[in-house]
Amino acid sequence: MAKLHDLYKDTVVAELQKQFGYKSVMQVPRIEKITLNMGVGEAISDKKVLEHATNDLTAISGQKPITTVARKSVAGFKIREGYPIGTKVTLRGERMWEFLERLISISIPRIRDFRGLNPKSFDGRGNYSMGVREQIIFPEIEYDKIDKIRGLDITITTSAKDNEEGLALLSAFDFPFKKKV
């Protein structure tokens, strides 16, 4: 079992229950899923690009991603409805906890010019989204084997009711948020 999951069950639940005054442990916010999304606009002209992006996301997540398609045609972007334009994967359970552990302890410290995550990136319902400019911050990606540096979006979906609860939950896992000056 992942260390972060044990930390959550053993200490974080008790801390948050005390901090927010919950009567039941079931009211304590928890991480429900982590979604990784890689939009690949170049896939319109070259199908191999989408294949490389899928391989990168598979290596990062340990799970096969699905291909996302355009919902409607946009002439300005030269895309038609149904064109494959990206790839995404949703992590839950054990894989989610292991990915979160690798993200916090290994990948985030490898980001160039990193000064902390923006605490304002919550959506109003306790879910946190962040963008990564380079997929090479993940140790599973070998620099020599990638065709191009791509970014990806990471969304952490929680059961928190508001941003304050979500921030408290992720801070309990030692997420490196920027400190208010």
From Swiss-Prot:
Record-linked PANTHER family: 60S RIBOSOMAL PROTEIN L11-RELATED (PTHR11994)
Pfam family, one: Ribosomal_L5
Keyword vocabulary terms for this entry: Ribonucleoprotein, Ribosomal protein, RNA-binding, rRNA-binding, tRNA-binding
Protein name: Large ribosomal subunit protein uL5
GO molecular function list: rRNA binding; structural constituent of ribosome; tRNA binding
One BP term from GO: translation
PROSITE patterns with a match to the protein in the record: RIBOSOMAL_L5
NCBIfam families (alphabetical): PRK00010.1
Cystine connections: none
Origin superkingdom: Bacteria
Similarity annotation: Belongs to the universal ribosomal protein uL5 family.
Function: This is one of the proteins that bind and probably mediate the attachment of the 5S RNA into the large ribosomal subunit, where it forms part of the central protuberance. In the 70S ribosome it contacts protein S13 of the 30S subunit (bridge B1b), connecting the 2 subunits; this bridge is implicated in subunit movement. Contacts the P site tRNA; the 5S rRNA and some of its associated proteins might help stabilize positioning of ribosome-bound tRNAs.
Organism whose genome encodes this protein: Colwellia psychrerythraea (strain 34H / ATCC BAA-681) (Vibrio psychroerythus)
Annotated InterPro entries: Ribosomal_uL5 (IPR002132), Ribosomal_uL5_bac-type (IPR020930), Ribosomal_uL5_C (IPR031309), Ribosomal_uL5_CS (IPR020929), Ribosomal_uL5_dom_sf (IPR022803), Ribosomal_uL5_N (IPR031310)
GO CC annotation: ribonucleoprotein complex; ribosome
Quaternary structure note: Part of the 50S ribosomal subunit; part of the 5S rRNA/L5/L18/L25 subcomplex. Contacts the 5S rRNA and the P site tRNA. Forms a bridge to the 30S subunit in the 70S ribosome.
